[in-house]
Amino acid sequence: MWATLAKKIFGTANDRRLKGYRPKVAAINALEPEIQKLSDEELAAQTITLRAQLAEGKTLDDLIVPAFATVREAARRVLGQRHFDVQLIGGMVLHEGGIAEMRTGEGKTLVATLATYLNALAGQGVHVVTVNDYLARRDAEWMGQVYRFLGLSTGIIVHGLDDAQRREAYAADITYGTNNEFGFDYLRDNMKYELSHMVQRGHAFAIVDEVDSILIDEARTPLIISGPSDDKSDLYNLVDTLIPKLNDEDFELDEKQRSTNLTEAGNEHIEELLREIGALHDGSLYDAVNVTLVHHVNQALRAHKLFQRDKDYIERNGEIVIIDEFTGRMMPGRRYSEGLHQALEAKEHVQVQPENVTLASITFQNYFRLYKKLAGMTGTAATEADEFAEIYRLEVVSIPTNNPVRRHDEDDEVYRSGEEKLRAITREIEAAGQTLQPMLVGTTSIEKSEQLAAFMLQQGYKQIDFSEPKALQKLYAAARSGKPSKLFAVLNARFHEQEAYIVAEAGVPGAITIATNMAGRGTDIKLGGNVDMRVEQECASLPPGPDRDAKEAEIRAEVDSFRDQAIAAGGLYIIGTERHESRRIDNQLRGRSGRQGDPGRSKFFLSLKDDLMRIFGSDRMESMLLKLGLKEDEAIVHPWINKALEKAQQKVEARNFEMRKNILKYDNVMNDQRKVVFEQRREMMGQDSLEEMIHDMRTGVVDDLVGKFVPHDAYPEAWDIEGLTQGLETALNLALPLADWAKEEGITDEAMHERLQQAAETAYAERAERNGPDLMRYIEKQVVLQVLDHLWREHLVTLDHLRQVIGWRGLAQRDPLNEYKSEAFALFDELITQLRETTTAQLSRVEVAFAPSADQSPFETLAAAAPFDPVPAVPPLAASLALEGPTETGQTAVSFMPQQGVEAFNGRDVLVAAEPTIPTLERNADDPKSWGRVGRNEPCPCGSGKKYKHCHGMIS
């Protein structure tokens, strides 16, 4: 009570924040008449004036008033749109690095121009991030008119651009693109071998559109660049045949936690089935040698019991395509990791693609935290304000609407079963259709949308076929006649090509649009229809002239008439068929109605069998409703139901927040190491010579060898001369008379150390002289970078495996996170040691084995042949330096191995890239000392067929 009273007297924190912006809004308005007097040339020259003021020492904050006034006037002249006062406030929130929560239809795209222009004046580049290529192109072309008028350059980053085009786009003052493209470019840049090949120029300021979708919904999705690994499709298909044979008592299913596990009986049953097909020979399923089988069984079990076709994924053209649980959109190119996607392919009997090995990865959480300043816009952020503040340090400011919201949100109706709910929804659609009220019916999955569509077809409705050229003419004709059309459109992942068109016409009187979740987000539903899209569709075949002008005028008049009809019918009616786990998604659905002061209404129809009610609702809810005498086809409507559902949603949101926080804690460990590796890489690429670093590495290797085989202050008789001889051969390619040295009178460990160091330096200097010092400097840099990349990839795999099993440490009363940090640090320390040893060993064997052309030096020939870029621009191929086995002279020759090009990148989550050729030494299967460092997941060099970690790796 006191909190409510205090809010009435003092206002909320949001109200006080808004009040602080009012003086600057007033100053911008006061400057407007003066700005309006400027000619187009004088207005455009404001950019030069403002940049000059920055150079003289003014800050961006000092320039808010003139900059915003300039953009407002430019938008009025170029677009015919003038920023409202509330939009000016939104621009200030973005400039300060906050999140502007603005309702649908309030002009977020236009608001972004204010902060974008102001920050672009600094010349460090501004990134405007959208959720898909369509919106990136649309916004760049639309708002780009304003920026170009003011003398700023714009670029766009979408799929299909080569590196030169990307570099040009990033060099622009303002760059539009999708979150995935920005993230993947960052990863690809950190796999380049020359600074000049990189495309991004830094991370100064980013404005993220639909910030909740990208930073909350996508937070758990890592961006992964990967390369193919071994083909195990037969094993996936084999294990897949066993899962349907399991009984209900063989596994436990937890829908809340999205997990499934075999019971003790299930373990025995699956072991029996595996033995029958010859996949399990000796011992238990959980013996170390069978760890791969356990992994395949677990993923197959998840694929069959947790993932549903047409809800979590669809089968399209022989491929499994993931469906975004929040938007209902397909995500082509994105694949589940850790073999789950392969298990789904086996389940649906399509070709099982090879698993991928991670080359580089980063989460959106960590990518967007690279920016010095980050801002965002969305229609719904208040429910996640705590998460934005805690994870990203972003404050959410709710911007008031320019016109009051006139949408009426009604209480939910709850029915006993799904069939009763469908009948109630159809009755509601029938009733609203009598007045030609446009309706948007939101569902949570493709399966649910098609279930409702099938039910409506049974009731005599007809589905609009958008493959027909004049698909909507019947709907327009019905609107003209004032009679219900009984036509409906379906928008889900199957019809995503027509998404913008279907959504644009959802505001036509009498239109019924069934959509999955937030499909079509980013496209406004305008009452009466979208006049521009309709003109484009219906006038496309008409040449410019009187006939086209007349047709366009006719369409515009009809759309205005339809708008009046839709308003008279009550505006857009949002019908929700199920509550989502997140209140934010429900609010987004409701927010499609009542844009810019239009009327509207919304209501959710629920059943006790809905997922949220069944999994997260109170166990007593169903029994209580039945005691109240709830009969068939009878609904209960009560504010208590809404509160109970909201509590269930809050529980789910809190759980998801904790999961994201926990993931971030673990990811931060890898992120800290990633920063070190990427910064070190960039520093090495920027140096002309790594001679000093290579010298330090060589010195470190000698120190390690002496420390291992020549104990300090020990007599020569105690030295391990045989071990030292082998160590020098492996690590430094040196054959020295160590036994004779050890017999010398008065020889000490310090003297031995000094001789070894001198011998290593002399041998390397001679090699550099033979190859040419300039060429050797070039080779040194490429070898160090390639070895670092190879070790980093293996390190990522090892960390991933560690993360999967570290949770079991909790059973021993040890904190898994601290254990993970400790072991990850030890592994990283080992990586540094291996980098030193492997680089030194490789460079000690380098010998150039080709003749340069007559007019080129060896360095020029090598540089021209091998750009050393493991992720080249598509489509050219790159050549990669490889170190072959010893030649007849006992040296290792440099050759040029053509490298596979990067496969066309269609996707969001995983880029399948060719794996760079890694310098390797010739290995003798019978001599483990010749193997060098073997990756834990590589086949054991002994030829057993097992992974190294399950063979000689266990011994070592």
From Swiss-Prot:
Its cofactor is Zn(2+). Zn(2+) binds at C940, C942, C951, H952. May bind 1 zinc ion per subunit. It is an enzyme of class 7 (translocase). Its EC number is 7.4.2.8. The keyword Thylakoid does not apply. One of its GO terms (cellular component) is plasma membrane. It is a peripheral membrane protein. ATP binds at Q87, G105, E106, G107, K108, T109, D524. GO terms for biological process: intracellular protein transmembrane transport; protein import; protein targeting; protein transport by the Sec complex. GO terms for molecular function: ATP binding; metal ion binding; protein-exporting ATPase activity. It catalyses: ATP + H2O + cellular proteinSide 1 = ADP + phosphate + cellular proteinSide 2. It is found in: Cell inner membrane; Cytoplasm. Monomer and homodimer. Part of the essential Sec protein translocation apparatus which comprises SecA, SecYEG and auxiliary proteins SecDF-YajC and YidC. Belongs to the SecA family. Part of the Sec protein translocase complex. Interacts with the SecYEG preprotein conducting channel. Has a central role in coupling the hydrolysis of ATP to the transfer of proteins into and across the cell membrane, serving both as a receptor for the preprotein-SecB complex and as an ATP-driven molecular motor driving the stepwise translocation of polypeptide chains across the membrane. This is Protein translocase subunit SecA. It comes from Beijerinckia indica subsp. indica (strain ATCC 9039 / DSM 1715 / NCIMB 8712). The gene is secA.
